[in-house]
UniProtKB/Swiss-Prot annotation:
Role played: Required for the formation of a threonylcarbamoyl group on adenosine at position 37 (t(6)A37) in tRNAs that read codons beginning with adenine. Is involved in the transfer of the threonylcarbamoyl moiety of threonylcarbamoyl-AMP (TC-AMP) to the N6 group of A37, together with TsaE and TsaB. TsaD likely plays a direct catalytic role in this reaction.
Enzyme Commission code(s) on record: 2.3.1.234
Family: Belongs to the KAE1 / TsaD family.
UniProt-annotated location(s): Cytoplasm
UniProt keyword terms in alphabetical order: Acyltransferase, Cytoplasm, Iron, Metal-binding, Transferase, tRNA processing
Superkingdom of origin: Bacteria
Broad enzyme group: transferase
Reaction(s) the record says it catalyses: L-threonylcarbamoyladenylate + adenosine(37) in tRNA = N(6)-L-threonylcarbamoyladenosine(37) in tRNA + AMP + H(+)
Name this protein carries in UniProt: tRNA N6-adenosine threonylcarbamoyltransferase
Cofactor annotation: Fe(2+)
GO MF annotation terms: iron ion binding; N(6)-L-threonylcarbamoyladenine synthase activity
Keyword Transferase appears in the UniProt entry: yes
Length: 335
């Protein structure tokens, strides 16, 4: 049996979890900073780092207490190594190093995006080869995994990540941070849809582009304002969301067919979007494919996903050392 303490501080959530055997959550504690960043309309790196410093010890202690384990019960300590905000990452890494050194435990550095994918291991057993659609504030990627721990990025955003596009459109629509859930909530009230462009790029490309769609929203708002027209904000939000979902789902379906995988997993903060979850479920309903969609608690940043990924690494004999450092631009291909 393995019992891993995992720590995640890559952005604005301070999280710790205890994961047993890679698929059982003994505890999963998250301290959010959302209110602190909301008035700025986005995450302020220095504020995020300071908040992590203030609460990381208490969050770790709460995770251990809820799991009813002590440091002596642990097999290893895992922590997000990158990518993310360098100052935020360092807080978690130093906390993990201190625990590992003090208690003679192995230290495992985990890639944040790999963690999002392995969050699905806490839902059902991952079956390789598989295809992962990762959608978050900083990432939009289609990833083919031929086997456990092997990542091939077959498509990625060329400009804005989908979560970033949601935040920018939310600001344009005078909606509060975070943008994703607020744009979705507004779209749900729409009685009509304003048709917006879909960016398909080259015929065979699995890459994404959302800057043009974002610009189309801004242009519609500006043109309506100049003409004295009151924009139907709900219809515009719905049109934006439908455009995003159509492209994400279509490229995922095409990649599944080309790579002939039997399991598709959804991962990342934007995986919480009801419209995307519904569209993917419908797209694969009549296909010989298993679609894994994590519960909402495992979509946004958390440490349980880091622990699940760390368990896979532990079984493959992968561990770090005390020289580990923050790697804010860590590519998944080199992980």
């Amino acid at each position: 049996m393995t019992t891993i303490l995992a720590i995640e501080t890559s952005c604005d959530e301070t999280a710790a979890a205890v994961i047993e055997n890679g698929d059982t959550i003994r505890s999963n504690v998250v301290a959010t900073q959302m209110e602190s960043h909301a008035r700025f309309g986005g995450v302020v790196p220095e504020i995020a780092s300071r908040h992590h410093v203030e609460v990381v010890t208490a969050v770790v202690e709460e995770a251990l207490e809820k799991a009813k384990v002590t440091y002596q019960d642990l097999t290893a300590v895992a922590v997000t190594e990158g990518p993310g905000l360098v100052g935020a990452l360092l807080v978690g890494i130093h906390a993990a190093k201190a625990i590992a050194f003090a208690h003679g435990l192995p230290l495992i550095g985990v890639h944040h995006i790999a963690g999002h994918i392995y969050a699905n291991q806490l839902v059902a057993k991952l079956q390789f080869p598989l295809l992962a659609l990762v959608v978050s504030g900083g990432h939009t990627e289609l990833i083919y995994m031929e086997k456990d721990g092997q990542f091939q990025v077959i498509g990625q955003t060329r400009d804005d990540a989908v979560g970033e596009a949601y935040d920018k459109v939310a600001r344009a629509l005078a909606l509060p941070y975070p943008g994703g859930p607020n744009v979705e909530q507004l779209a749900d009230t729409a009685e009509a849809t304003l048709d917006l462009p879909r960016s398909w790029l080259e015929k065979d490309s699995y890459d994404f582009s959302f800057s043009g769609l974002k610009s189309a929203v801004l242009n519609r708002l500006n043109n309506d304002k100049q003409r004295g027209i009151v924009t139907d904000r709900a219809a515009l939000a719905k049109g934006f969301q439908e455009s995003v979902v159509d492209v994400l789902v279509a490229k995922t379906v095409r990649a599944q067919a080309q790579f002939n995988v039997k399991q598709v997993v959804l991962a990342g903060g934007v995986a919480a979007n009801k419209g995307l979850r519904k569209a993917l479920t419908e797209a694969f309903a009549n296909k010989d494919v298993t679609l894994l969609v994590p519960p909402l608690s495992l979509c946004t940043d958390n440490a349980a996903m880091i622990g699940a990924c760390a368990h896979s690494m532990w079984l493959r004999g992968i561990a770090g050392n005390m020289a580990m450092n923050a790697r804010p631009g860590l590519p998944l291909s080199s992980f």
